[in-house]
Amino acid sequence: MSRPDKTPRALIHWGADRFDKAGLVYGHGTDNALDEAASLVLHTLEIGYDQPDTVLDVEVSETDYARVLRLLEQRVTSRKPAAYLMDEAWFAGMPFYVDERVLVPRSPIAELISAQFSPWVDPDRVTSILDIGTGSGCIAIACAAAFTQARVDAADLSRDALDVARINTARHDLEGRVQLIESDLFSAL
């Protein structure tokens, strides 16, 4: 397969073509090759999704070009989810650090949290929240952001997962509101 031009747009299309030919599986943040390639290219080049399309046609440096090609090839050869390659996943409109110590956040619960579980829950009456099996802490942190008056307990059996959740509570400045607890289900609660 020939190398692409040195623009983000060309790199995205080249990556998507490589992903399709490799038969990659998606579902950890994206659901198709083009979105997955765009996510990796834009992340590597630090291009925000809110940038005008014209930035996609500007040539990148040799160094950045090589970095992008390496990451796209790594996605094909390792078959690891893009979130693990970028150390980042989005949940409920918020970025989270992730690595292989936790599952990649992907849940329809994000939409419920963003809507404060309306119409089933009165947000003013929520004072405490428990997230069991917190992993990266994404559900607990998104709940803390949505229910600002609530105390949130986030429990997990895995110390490794709690270490990742700790990174995320600090990233979102919620150390004082989200308590991380090592617990096998309810054993330490």
State where each predicted segment sits.
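SAM-dependent Rossmann-like transferase core, predominantly class I methyltransferases
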Residues: L56, A66-T148, V152-I167, E182, ...
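N-terminal auxiliary segments of SAM/dcSAM-dependent transferases
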Residues: S2-F91
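Conserved SAM-binding strand-loop segment of SAM-dependent methyltransferases
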Residues: D173-L185
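Short helix-terminating capping/connector loops at secondary-structure junctions
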Residues: G29-D31, D122-R125, E175
